[in-house]
Amino acid sequence: MSDIKQHYTDFDEYLRQGEPSQKEKASIWQTAIGLQAVDGLQTSDYLKATACKHIEGEINIDEARELITSYYQSKTQREPDDDEKQEADKVSANITKILSSQTLDFSTGGYVSVHRRVFDGVFKHAGKLRDYDITKREWVLDGDTVNYLNWEDLRRAIDYDISQEKVFSYKGISTDVMVEHITRFVSGLWQIHAFCEGNTRTTAVFTILYLRSIGLKVDNSLFAHHSWYFRNALVRANYKNALKGIDYTFVYLERFFRNLLLGEKWDLRNRYLHIHATDEWKVQPKLHPTSTPQVPHK
């Protein structure tokens, strides 16, 4: 790889100075890589170098995916974090392929298909609904868990949420109502937690595809740089504990979507979301004025 391409490995230079096609590819790669943070994963230097080859037009996305697969198949010296990096690398490339397409099957089958495609070559259970109940200890909840849906009703619940969204009309509503509605739709879909693993990444990709499909311009940098906030905001939107005096709160997720869709600048740091935030972190500030809001074409 040349010195120039090495310099561009963080993608920022492509976003600032690249050709339009390079900017688009760099933005998608940055989003795909950033989404790995929801599970504490980091990609390898090899993945970033391969991504640059794709951005430069030297290889297509399928060739990039093949290179990554071959890299791990032929690697002789194993590192302690190879399994995690392999997952992050392969999933990032898979997400890049998905987000490079403008197609979306907005149905239960389409949602399940996104999971299958995101985790193709990574999980044996990719594209399969879970068949057991789950709990997950959350840092933002001080070790407690969200109550996820029981496994017997997963498909029925996804069917219902998507059917309700299909008939919802965005015509004539305010941007505030639009954001509130999108927040609750995405929160409800995520709370189902349809899969054994990879629910947040699947929901994020499906959300990006859906918002684009109804005419909204999505600021990919929000998912690229604040994916863990996105996950923690989903957790807070779906957690209630009467003994602790904690109710469901959508405000943190709404602020993520206000930044994403309206150009607002809420400070998206995770400490504001902790159920026992210190006084310093109790009030989440808005940093800058808004830009011109969007109206969806639906």
Describe the role of every protein-language-model region.
Residues 1-298:
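FIC/Doc superfamily catalytic core
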